[in-house]
From Swiss-Prot:
It comes from Arabidopsis thaliana. Substrate binds at T385, Q415, R527, W529. This is Probable pectinesterase/pectinesterase inhibitor 47. Coiled coil: none annotated. It catalyses: [(1->4)-alpha-D-galacturonosyl methyl ester](n) + n H2O = [(1->4)-alpha-D-galacturonosyl](n) + n methanol + n H(+). The keyword Disulfide bond applies. The gene is PME47. GO terms for cellular component: extracellular region. GO terms for biological process: cell wall modification; pectin catabolic process.
Length: 624
């Protein structure tokens, strides 16, 4: 690292408080970021005749959907105080947890109070970290010749992620003020946001390490300790809120409520109105009037605030999607309706970012391979994996329908993302994602994909979201010579994160280039990017493109006893599990375990998907 940053690094270490400087209980997890998969020198280990009996770690089940009951004004018997050593058992770092909670003057009876205390510490430290990173970024921008392009990009990512984490923690702090009356949906959102903070921190650190930044060396220990503070808070808050739900019998409720204004439309009706009214350069300003004239419609429907069009005609509102996004209002609520962007058929060579303040945006195209958003940023060309995306979305409740997203960098450019998604309650319907390595970055929070096509090679569905894929086609492409394909690479770093990749009723097959040369490479269902990686395949067709062992290790035996990989009721020539890996973190799921990874139970999608009017099923296709 050059001398210009040494003083700022020293400032960073001074600026961060005692909570960051507690000695770590173990070094931060820093596995490499998506290297090309090279052939193994040893053949895969053959499993025994019976699959392992240890099931994957399951997300907690949700309580019955009963009306919330207010807490009693006074409990019949006063619960005994809860000492820190007991409360800290719910966290992955009990020693650090006890050190932090030693500042609490008296032991409360409810672990929620411990969680609330640590949340204050988290928010305080997150704000300080954001300031430190922003100051460093300003120094780098002022004197760019002293830093590499990769370092500049990685530091910029850290600044963006740090600001996001502050916003998430502020939201959580506000929600926790009424923790006793929280519904399951709000609990799920709170724990998802806290899990997202942990993911943001890890993404920052990974990016700095990949960029070989001296800043990473200097700030690595404080970053690691702050990540542990976040993990401690996540464990305490998750345990406390789930305990309160059971205690007060809270209902599922709704995380994103609806309203009766401005206009409610079925999704397919909305699409037809847009395409008919705006066909061949007609004045699309009539679209909003037509929607208003249709008014309330029976059956499923969505709320529409305003509709704008993107295209080459003079009657279109905007020539680019980026300009249309910029025109959307900021910080809108669900009851205000969607800001609908209709992008005509065409090739849009632009890099679109939907920021955290742009919420309730619905992007509608003319269909797969008709409305195409394309870019070619890649890791080899100096972009971080996080920022190589052609299309990035952070704003809550984003919906995309009938759009193709591409990254055309090619396999020789390594990591090159088509879509990066860290938007809570986001949905992609009838879309396609085309790339090679790292095509679809399901970064964080809760996501749903329905009837989509995903193409790629190495780790082409990766990240640390709670992402569900229903009725999708997943195609492995032909990589470079001596590389192996992995469909998924989930990145859970904390056992309390309610994240994972759930693939239900999908087809896993070969793209045309690989189908023409099937013996050119080996394809696997996934590999563990991080220690608590979690992925399941349920009631899906698995073709013979998948190797009989099914799964691939990341780095030797690392994480194979802490991951959660499972399969349930799949079919097809590649679904035979008799030769699957014999890792302790892999198993064949039973019905009850598989149900934990459905829309109803894994993401509580039934509390936020109905407002999109996109079809979904909450459980399994069949249970026989």
């Amino acid at each position: 690292m050059q001398t210009h940053s040494s003083s700022l690094v020293f400032l960073a270490l001074l600026c961060l408080s005692w909570a960051l400087l507690v000695s770590p209980t173990r070094p931060p997890s820093q596995p490499p970021s998506h290297p090309p998969i090279q052939p193994s020198s040893q053949p895969p280990t053959q499993p025994p005749s019976q699959p392992p009996t240890q099931p994957p770690t399951q997300p907690p089940s949700h309580p019955p959907t009963q009306p919330p009951t207010p807490p009693p004004s006074q409990s019949p018997s006063q619960p005994s105080p809860l000492p820190p050593n007991i409360a800290c058992k719910s966290t992955p770092y009990p020693k650090l947890c006890r050190t932090i909670l030693s500042a609490v003057k008296s032991s409360p009876s409810d672990p929620y109070h411990y969680g609330k205390f640590t949340m204050k510490q988290c928010l305080k430290q997150a704000r300080r970290l954001s300031k430190v990173i922003n100051r460093f970024a300003q120094r780098v921008e002022a004197d760019p010749g002293t830093s590499t392009v990769e370092e500049v990009s990685a530091v910029a990512d850290c600044g963006e992620l740090a600001e996001l984490s502050v916003e998430y923690l502020e939201t959580v702090t506000e929600e926790l003020k009424a923790a006793e009356l929280m519904t399951a949906a709000l609990v799920d959102r709170v724990t998802s946001l806290l899990g997202g903070v942990v993911t943001n921190q890890q993404t920052c650190l990974d990016g700095l390490v990949d960029a070989k930044s001296g800043f990473a060396t200097a700030i690595g220990t404080p970053l690691g300790n702050l990540t542990r503070l976040y993990s401690v808070s996540l464990g305490l808050v998750s345990h406390a809120l789930n305990r309160n739900l059971k205690r007060y019998k809270g209902s599922k409720g709704k995380i994103f409520g609806g309203g009766n204004k401005p206009v409610r439309e079925p999704l397919e009706t909305l699409i037809k109105v847009l395409r008919k009214t705006c066909d061949k350069g007609k004045d699309c300003r009539k679209a909003n009037r037509n929607l208003g004239e249709l008014g309330e419609t029976s059956g499923g429907s969505i709320l529409v605030r305003e509709a704008v069009t993107v295209g080459p005609y003079e009657t279109d509102n905007f020539p680019t999607i980026t300009e249309a996004v910029a025109a959307a209002p900021n910080h809108t609520f669900p009851e205000q309706g969607y800001f609908v962007i209709y992008a005509r058929a065409g090739l849009y060579e632009e890099y679109v970012v939907i920021s955290n303040k742009k919420r309730n945006i619905m992007l509608i195209g003319d269909g797969i391979n008709k409305t195409i958003i394309s870019g070619n940023h890649s890791f080899i060309d100096g972009w971080t994996t996080y920022n190589s995306s052609t299309f990035a979305v952070v704003g809550d409740r984003f919906v995309a329908v009938d759009v193709t997203f591409r990254n055309t960098a090619g396999p020789e450019k390594h990591q090159a993302v088509a879509v990066r998604n860290n938007a809570d309650g986001s949905t992609f319907y009838r879309c396609s994602f085309e790339g090679y390595q790292d095509t679809l970055y399901v970064h964080s929070l809760r996501q749903f994909y329905r009837e989509c096509d995903i193409y790629g090679t190495i780790d082409f569905i990766f990240g640390n979201a709670a992402a569900i894929f229903q009725n999708c086609n997943i195609y492995a492409r032909k990589p470079m010579a001596n590389q192996k394909n992995a469909v998924t690479a989930h990145g859970r770093t904390d056992p309390n994160q309610k994240t994972g990749i759930s693939i239900i009723n999908c087809t896993i097959g070969a793209a045309p280039d690989l189908a023409a040369d099937p013996k050119s490479t080996m394809t696997f269902l996934g590999r563990p990017w991080k220690p608590y990686s979690r992925t399941v395949y349920i009631q899906s067709y698995i073709s013979d493109v998948v190797q009989p062992v099914g799964w691939l290790e990341w780095n030797g035996t690392t994480g194979l006893d802490t991951i959660s990989y499972g399969e349930y009721d799949n079919f097809g020539p590649g679904a035979d599990t008799s030769k699957r890996v014999q890792w302790s973190g892999y198993s064949l799921l039973n019905l009850v375990q598989a149900m934990n990874f459905t829309v109803y139970n894994f993401t509580l999608g039934d509390t936020w998907l109905p407002q999109t009017d996109i079809p979904f099923y909450g459980g399994l296709l069949h249970t026989e």
